[in-house]
Swiss-Prot record:
It comes from Escherichia fergusonii (strain ATCC 35469 / DSM 13698 / CCUG 18766 / IAM 14443 / JCM 21226 / LMG 7866 / NBRC 102419 / NCTC 12128 / CDC 0568-73). It comes from the Bacteria. The gene is rnfH. This is Protein RnfH. SUPFAM superfamilies: MoaD/ThiS. HAMAP family: UPF0125_RnfH. InterPro entries: Mopterin_synth/thiamin_S_b, RnfH, RnfH_sf. It holds the Pfam family Ub-RnfH. Belongs to the UPF0125 (RnfH) family.
Amino acid sequence: MPGKIAVEVAYALPEKQYLQRVSLQEGATVEEAIRASGLLELRTDIDLTKNKVGIYSRPTKLSDTVHDGDRVEIYRPLIADPKELRRQRAEKSANK
């Protein structure tokens, strides 16, 4: 018989951070942890078909299993391409 595990679900915005602790059955998935956290109802900007997720900064799939003590992270979409930003900064410093 599977036991209970404790997992944290995190979502960070520039102005506010959300950290929810949930208790799940062993064998639960990343998606189940996120749904149990209530963040999908609290933050309508989270779309699991678009937002990437991870466990302790390592990208993962919604179907991956969580383990006791894991921190599931929901990542915001990038608003700018990092390569493009680096190129623009390099051009700007070259023109000085």
